[in-house]
């Protein structure tokens, strides 16, 4: 294959995953509007399932009391909700703080990683639905009712994720919120047409009969949805189930967080059957190819497009790359500054994806985890 053809292929795949796929999803949503799955209504007048809300925590003393209080304030029958804090090797007083705050069950576990803590908590409870949340994520009062509604509406639903909004109390932005809005639009349409291709750790739930233990180095966010779809379950989004989470204050910090996340993600991509379409519906396979496979291939595709591009286009790419790596580009006034900040965010995230792969191949991926700096604020109460 000649260089021009290689360039067109790489550029075309990048254009498809970034622009073409979202447009195709939007068109499919419109064409299938009458056939797409209706969003389930809230379930106040239905028999509500029992729910165990599991909060894995490592060194979360400063925020765990606020999180437990937030869980207790959810608009869900108290007799059907069990709040569990699964402490993963916390030596900072997190277990004691969780007990004082009123958690129903506090597990003081040896250090084993987030997934091990979650699995242990699931094994020690018996609710119909198992919900999960991070210690620094605060749910809206009706979030749990909204999260369980799809399980009630359809017995084929095995996984449901909600929506998390990233906030910065200081008023700044690391661009994660803007990217996340784009991601949420894709997820909403994927859910309506088939199933989501990934979730989030801030707000999600699994039907107990669908729950599977995954490798401790593979997080639920990426691994569970496509695994459960392969088992015949639906993995949906509940748009009305909302949570907020404090973002990392700056783009550089967000890039460092993404690099750590990508080290875990590459474990799933390469060793967690994410590239194996067997058992998936054809539509879901196309979604995984467009949204996930190409997303992780993007850094390599960018490199191929750069090397094989015509000279003038290569010069433009290098100019844009150089500008994006200059912090000042995001501080320019007006639309130019906003565009520069988004470009910088995109380039740094591509870099984080590539470096995450390097970290995974060089060092492997550990099950341990730590809260990213700047995403926790001490509870004054």
Label each PLM-derived region with a short phrase.
Residues 69-80:
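Short, acidic, metal-binding catalytic loop of nucleotide-sugar glycosyltransferases
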Residues 35-43, 257-321, 339-342, 364-381:
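Basic/Trp-rich segment in TM-proximal cytosolic loops or flexible interdomain/linker regions
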Residues 52, 60, 70, 84-95, ...:
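A conserved acidic beta->alpha catalytic loop
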Residues 1-43, 191, 321-327, 352:
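N-terminal membrane-anchoring/stem segments of glycan-assembly enzymes
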Residues 62-66, 91-100, 142:
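Acidic helix N-cap motif at the loop->helix transition within catalytic regions
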